[in-house]
């Protein structure tokens, strides 16, 4: 049966909130962080084409993730969500994609081994092509142009042609997301994540890392455990040769998201089939805004970034709108306070949600609240602040009687120097050597692995 032939189904959102919802009802709200396309005809043509293209994910994958996130809310799983600040179309090549997957697999191996529980692996890629900006325009040497808003909207080069929003880029974003998803699925189905051979996940350039010995000891321990289990069973354990892997991105460019919001056979309501796990950021989380209106109607698990300016009342009202039936696995709050503010700002939010008996998954984004600029103009993050915010999150949740259920990190499997500190003690002078991000700084492989190890050590302390 074609998607267009699916019969209308009851709208569970309207029943819950008393307000009618459709994939385009967001258009009646204030939509922030949206580009202005100069050619409405070209925009309509691109969206028409996008609507007829196949979805990027499936309904059963989305619902499986929601069930796993519900288990994370109960403390039975831990969420690892990571990837680029903003993907570039040029990064859609095998080496970059496999390295992204490798670093997440290695981090998850550390967490599974140390936390003794399953890890939900979610990539912040295969669709993370839009980026909110603090200003609509950028000025250089007296020339003012539209800000770069991610490859799905415009190009980073500082020219008038590059910065002009181009709706055809949405079609390119769909194609690059599909190629990325296809390659990730092929790697996983082909045994790339096989626990019988975790040594295959190694990144060659880190063979001399200060963390290498500790990690290789862990790999050997897991290999011994697998061998022992198979010896007892008298046969090879085949379900160790693949994993579940999901994607996420910021649902920022609503025309794109709407075009990939579909109904499917034997499922009520609407699903965003561009990603498994959409989120919205602080700049677009207004209760009466277009982005909240859009997210309230899709059946995907969703997440909201929560910053230091959010009040307990705002948080509870967001829950009322986005998860009125307290559905397990539906709603995550990703707090991003910054190491300097988390001790003051997070506890009142935890207390309010707990006191009201609301069901959410708490996730720590230790990146966005710790961004700073160096004297020579680089945006960076200090590793000690990133690690410190993660560790304080565990302490604050333990004190509040709540549970930190995951982390959300901007990272890469490449040998970049964008965040200072870490095992190699990178300094501001090192930033010039391999700073490749077009937007925000990312943890490199070693720093990412070190965060995973810090999570394990901290969890052992607060148990």
Q: Where are the predicted features?
A:
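Active-site-facing alpha/beta catalytic cores
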Residues: 86-87, 92-338, 381, 406-408, ...
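Long, contiguous, compositionally biased segments that the model treats as domain-scale units
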Residues: 2-154
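Glycine-rich, charged/polar anion/phosphate-binding loops
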Residues: 64-66, 288-291, 318, 346-349
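Non-transmembrane, aqueous-exposed alpha-helical and coiled segments at domain scale
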Residues: 315, 324, 330-362, 368-417
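Short glycine/proline-rich, acidic loop/turn segments that cap or connect secondary-structure elements
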Residues: 413-431
């Amino acid at each position: 049966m074609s998607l267009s032939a699916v019969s209308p189904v009851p709208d569970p959102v309207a029943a819950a909130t008393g307000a009618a919802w459709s994939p385009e009802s967001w258009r009646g709200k204030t939509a922030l962080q949206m580009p202005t396309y100069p050619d409405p005809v070209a925009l309509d043509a691109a969206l028409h084409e996008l609507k007829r293209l196949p979805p990027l994910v499936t309904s059963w994958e989305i619902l499986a993730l929601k069930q796993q996130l519900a288990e994370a809310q109960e403390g039975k799983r831990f969420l690892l969500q990571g990837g680029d600040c903003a993907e570039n179309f040029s990064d859609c090549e095998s080496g970059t994609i496999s390295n992204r997957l490798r670093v997440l697999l290695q981090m998850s191996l550390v967490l599974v081994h140390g936390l003794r529980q399953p890890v939900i692996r979610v990539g912040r890629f295969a669709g993370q092509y839009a980026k909110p900006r603090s200003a609509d325009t950028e000025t250089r040497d007296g020339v003012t142009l539209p800000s770069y808003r991610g490859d799905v909207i415009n190009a980073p080069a500082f020219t008038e042609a590059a910065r002009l929003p181009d709706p055809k880029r949405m079609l390119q974003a769909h194609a690059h997301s599909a190629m990325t998803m296809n390659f990730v699925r092929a790697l996983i189905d082909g045994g790339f994540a096989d626990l019988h051979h975790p040594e295959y996940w190694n990144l060659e350039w880190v063979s001399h890392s200060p963390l290498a010995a500790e990690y290789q000891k862990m790999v050997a321990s897991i290999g011994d455990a697998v061998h022992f289990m198979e010896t007892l069973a008298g046969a090879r354990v085949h379900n160790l040769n693949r994993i579940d892997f999901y994607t996420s991105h910021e649902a920022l460019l609503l025309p794109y998201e709407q075009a990939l919001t579909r109904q499917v056979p034997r499922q009520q309501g609407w699903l965003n089939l561009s990603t498994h796990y959409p989120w919205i950021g602080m700049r677009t989380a207004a209760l009466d805004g277009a982005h909240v209106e859009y997210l309230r109607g899709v059946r995907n698990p969703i997440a909201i970034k929560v910053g230091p300016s959010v009040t307990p009342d705002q948080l509870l009202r967001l829950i009322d709108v986005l998860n009125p039936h307290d559905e397990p696995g539906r709603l995550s709050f990703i707090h991003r306070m910054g190491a300097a503010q988390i001790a003051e700002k997070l506890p009142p939010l935890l207390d309010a949600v707990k006191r009201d008996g609301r069901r959410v998954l708490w996730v720590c984004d230790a990146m966005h609240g710790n961004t700073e600029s160096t004297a020579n103009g680089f945006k960076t993050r200090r590793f000690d602040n990133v690690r410190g915010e993660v560790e304080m999150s565990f302490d604050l949740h333990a004190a509040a009687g709540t549970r930190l259920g995951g982390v959300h990190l901007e990272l890469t499997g490449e040998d970049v120097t964008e965040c200072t500190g870490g095992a190699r003690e990178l300094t501001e002078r090192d930033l010039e050597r391999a700073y490749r991000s077009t937007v925000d700084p990312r943890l490199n492989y070693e720093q990412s692995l070190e965060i995973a190890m810090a999570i394990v050590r901290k969890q052992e302390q607060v148990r």
